[in-house]
Amino acid sequence: MAITPDDLRAAGAVIDAAGSVREAAATWRTRDPAMRVLVVDAHDMRDETPALRLGLRSVYLATSNGHCWSVTGQPELATALILTQH
């Protein structure tokens, strides 16, 4: 399941409106149960480039080979969103 530009815009709106990234993740999971959404500490993502920045919040795209996760800059390969708050 790829993440489309519309998905990313919609996720950005949800994340921007939420009181916290955890709340945003819960809202997005309810809205799109097929999409994996993870919340991690911003420090863990310090060497990665976000797909989207929303003030103190960042959204990263991730993909999995079934065993390992990796951050990707290619939405067509992404199967998950990773959210952080600085």
Where are these regions (language model features)?
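Negatively charged, low-complexity tracts enriched in Asp/Glu with abundant Ser/Thr
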Residues: 1-40
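Conserved N-terminal glycine/acidic-rich loop preference
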Residues: 4-5, 15-18, 46-61
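Translation machinery proteins
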Residues: 39-40, 45-47
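Short, compact, well-ordered microdomains
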Residues: 55-86
